[in-house]
Structure formats: C-alpha cells, structure tokens
Amino acid sequence: MESSTEGAPYRQLKAWAESRDLAVLIYKLCFRRAKTIDRGLADQIRRAAISIPSNIAEGNGRGTNRDSLRFLYIARGSLCELESQIDVCLRAGLIEAGDSRNVTDQMALVGRLIGGLISYRKSRPD
C-alpha cells in the first residue's frame, strides 16, 4: 500500500531531507551513547532533532508563506537548541569529537538550507 504522504510536496525540499537525515543521525548517536548520555538529556536532544523536519513539513503544508515562515522559524529555533545540546554533550565528554563533527557538519548544512528557504519564502507574496 502506498503512503498518502509519499508524494507530499515537503519531500521535495532539500531542507526537509537533510533535516530528516540529521534526526536519524541524532537517534543513532543517542542509541550508541545510551550509557553516557542521561535519559532526560537524550530525550530532549531527540525531541529537538525530530522537531526540525516536522516543522519544515508542517509549514510546507500550510496555505500561505506567512504560515510556512512561522514553522521555518520554529525549525530554526529547534536547530539552535540542538546545536547547544550537542555542544554541552561534547564539552561534558558525553560524546566523542568524531560523532560531534558529523552531527555539527549536518547541522550547519541544515541551517544554511533553512536560511535559504526562509529567504525564498520571504520574497514570495502570500
């Protein structure tokens, strides 16, 4: 059976695809580091990570650029939250520099893509 979201327009957005990949990286990292990252922090990290593609998708499903922008700003805020949490984990020795580098590179890419999408949406009339 084909998913009703298989052809959803948000799936065409590179920002969504890369943020989904970031969320997968984060989930895998939290699973691998389950013994070093406490449960509460891991839950918060996962929530911030999954919020990014979720808000991009929801915003893209809205009818106006204004609505879409609101959700893109929320996605960008969640990305900032995630960046802060990963930085704390690295400085506390809860994750290794190699893990952090992969995630940091992906977060930077997602940030650029969200910024580009925000600029595009701002330039479009409702």
Question: What is each stretch, according to the model?
Answer:
Residues 1-126:
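Amphipathic alpha-helical assembly/interaction segments
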